[in-house]
Regions:
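Short catalytic/metal-binding and nucleic-acid-binding patches
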Residues: 1-177
């Protein structure tokens, strides 16, 4: 049995990462990013998920989250987002991505013709304030390290936009202190 990435204390904040299969660039359109943010909002309102920080990159996202049913909430978030992405991509003329999501579907995934997300979400419990600050810095600076922006607050699809610049964010975070 795998034990490296498990949620043992769901109310504890966890750093999570979810990636698109084969690192395909799904989140290169505003609408696909917005689908993920809508799913965050749904899980906050209906499942008690707290989202303390987040960033969306072209093929994955990172977040710091907590909630009473964390594994189920993340699973539902990914299912909802996958359905929306599969509906949205053809509208954007990105049928090639839909074809890739079908091609790279894991053989044991028989309930769908496509697989959008890699399995799992790699939860890491945040046990100290120092660890929280390190994960916040990692999330904030991900677009900077990729060379997409000069400063974290310039990335629209990340919580640094709100926290560091005081700008209206695409999705507002829950306080962690």
């Amino acid at each position: 049995m795998r034990t490296r990435y498990q949620v043992r204390e769901p109310h504890t904040a966890h750093f999570i990462t979810s990636s698109i299969v084969e690192w395909l660039p799904v989140f290169t359109s505003a609408r696909c990013c917005d689908l993920l943010l809508e799913s965050f909002a749904y899980c906050r309102e209906h499942k008690g998920l707290l989202i303390h920080a987040w960033v969306i990159l072209d093929n994955h996202f990172h977040a710091i989250v907590a909630g009473p049913q964390l594994p189920q909430s993340v699973s539902d978030l990914k299912k909802f987002t996958a359905r929306g992405i599969l509906a949205q991509l053809p509208l954007e003329g990105r049928d090639w991505l839909v074809n890739q999501l079908a091609y790279f579907r894991a053989p044991h995934k028989r309930e769908s013709a496509h697989q959008v997300w890699q399995e799992g979400f790699h939860p890491q419990a945040i046990t100290t304030e120092a660890m929280m600050l390190q994960k916040l810095e990692y999330i904030d600076n991900n677009p900077v390290r990729r060379g997409w922006v000069a400063s974290p607050e310039h990335w629209r699809y990340g919580s640094a936009h709100e926290r560091l610049a005081g700008a209206v964010a695409a999705f507002r975070c829950d306080p962690w202190r």
